[in-house]
Amino acid sequence: MEMEKEENVVYGPLPFYPIEEGSAGIQLHKYMHQYAKLGAIAFSNALTGVDISYQEYFDITCRLAEAMKNFGMKPEEHIALCSENCEEFFIPVLAGLYIGVAVAPTNEIYTLRELNHSLGIAQPTIVFSSRKGLPKVLEVQKTVTCIKKIVILDSKVNFGGHDCMETFIKKHVELGFQPSSFVPIDVKNRKQHVALLMNSSGSTGLPKGVRITHEGAVTRFSHAKDPIYGNQVSPGTAILTVVPFHHGFGMFTTLGYFACGYRVVMLTKFDEELFLRTLQDYKCTSVILVPTLFAILNKSELIDKFDLSNLTEIASGGAPLAKEVGEAVARRFNLPGVRQGYGLTETTSAFIITPEGDDKPGASGKVVPLFKVKVIDLDTKKTLGVNRRGEICVKGPSLMLGYSNNPEATRETIDEEGWLHTGDIGYYDEDEHFFIVDRLKSLIKYKGYQVPPAELESVLLQHPNIFDAGVAGVPDPDAGELPGAVVVMEKGKTMTEKEIVDYVNSQVVNHKRLRGGVRFVDEVPKGLTGKIDAKVIREILKKPQAKM
């Protein structure tokens, strides 16, 4: 009997593929073995030309899983990564999931303070570190004393007195071990067993440890293969990614690619010409980007020099993408639109995605299978209807189990009825397309009015002389906050602060005017996924304008 649907709650459809049995590790092990038999390539590093086949990935992940098991790792323990993007990144991720240990990914660019905080939460037994990350990991090990072993991730030989992966495997795997004989461990309760310990965005302070379950991960595999999003199990299909793997966005999209047998083509850094050449040479059908890169591509003079006829999709995620920028880039690549999605680390990536052939300009998409979403009034907390702006709340099988060792923050995020409060402002229309307006905590409070920075950023980006822009509130004793902007000008273009202020003020109502002024910068402060850093912008706006 079908459950009665709640009023003003938007439900996703039934999944095209049923959720498969077994842990995330069991399912990934099966996928790896399945695509290995087909001879498909799993990973390609476009910068170095290195390819790793599914067979090679299957063999080394099974060998590493066996080594960790023999080292003494138990399902309740954790391992961590500290590395930039590299072709080896997902080897310990998969191996850890095979044996039921939780995996905590971090990046070598973390400051010592951030890494100490993250690994202090994770409490890993083993840390897989890149050579770049090793000095910081060694420093952190002095205080995070649970770290028993450091293994070098991106080296074929031992480095800095520490075992590389191959040495670690040889020490802990019996001679003659056959990867095909390895059997992954199932977990007792995948709804409660932690698969990954991700870092929250840290937009309100140091990151929190987000506990993602095996249930959440396997639900994502179902979405990754769902043809409603233009996906299909198609071994060998090349997908280009420049998204950070340690971030939830990069982690879960890549694991989803493995579920489909795709060839993940990786660029460790963004270079405009190399990016376009990679799309051409690898015949990539899809590319996934953070919004920061859309502004660069929108102004690119190189696109027409490459054969990009295989490209059928550009996807955006990790941060809001301005409608006008997305539309402009789609036109440059002769595509009908940009596939958008919306989600959080706490929801195991996107719970709103644009279905194939059902996109709307400015919309993030529709609710995915097995999820339901509502919009609540910011003051009364009552559920709102169509075209009413409020906070977006979500329920579904991929919600985090909670924040690690932080019950207070968990209670603030997930209410007693199980709804996760995203902290984002948005609405849905008559066709159940969702539109994300802004971050609740980013709203500028001017004389009792709420001003969304994203709206002002969109206005600024529409000016032909402005390359990029970010908006934040400047503290004011009388008004509370004044909307202000930092602006990057197009090469060879100039405008005065007054010209920019007058332009914006002519486009918006009185309370949204740029009373906090404008600062000219070389680069808008943003995080790794392209999210604008309002805290840094606020500090820039507090300072007097430097003379040009």
From Swiss-Prot:
Family: Belongs to the ATP-dependent AMP-binding enzyme family.
Task performed by this protein: Produces green light with a wavelength of 570 nm.
Primary residence: other
Recorded superkingdom: Eukaryota
Catalytic reaction equation(s): firefly D-luciferin + ATP + O2 = firefly oxyluciferin + hnu + AMP + CO2 + diphosphate
Subunit text: Homodimer.
UniProt entry tagged with the keyword Ribonucleoprotein: no
Protein name listed in UniProt: Luciferin 4-monooxygenase
Origin species: Luciola mingrelica (Southern Russian firefly)
GO MF term set: ATP binding; CoA-ligase activity; magnesium ion binding; Photinus-luciferin 4-monooxygenase (ATP-hydrolyzing) activity
